[in-house]
């Protein structure tokens, strides 16, 4: 399967969003731009050919996914080509045009809006994920130093135990805990990979 991570992707050029969407679609509309004038509407369609060859696709989005990344997510979602996982996207669906002014100035105007294949406007709404998964922050629970037999008052000492064994053991445990804290854990990505494995396993059993 394929996991397409569009989280914190602020977007880019429209033609690149169309190419990325087209890579996973065989046919149909990818996105349309509509302005006040009906005649100025533009529609962009996919060409035949699926890069993933019907493999399951998960698209990750969050509040930092905007503009071109929302076009990709919206197109794959409307065509039911991918499952969108994460949180609501940013909602930047406006087409802005720079118009030169006399002299050395220019003005940027919003001239149209982006619409997904099903006719949804992205502007100020964004893409709603099929499966909402918020990023979880996992932390190690600090339990302090655990009490052992050797910590009890009047406990018998081990005659064969090296000196300061307990202190060295504590330092070792502290180092292991520090290493565990350093390892980042991406909960949303982990959920996406688990979902990909589940879908792939199911499809394999059905085909057999």
Please give the residue ranges for each predicted region:
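C-terminal "post-core" interaction segments
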Residues: 1-208
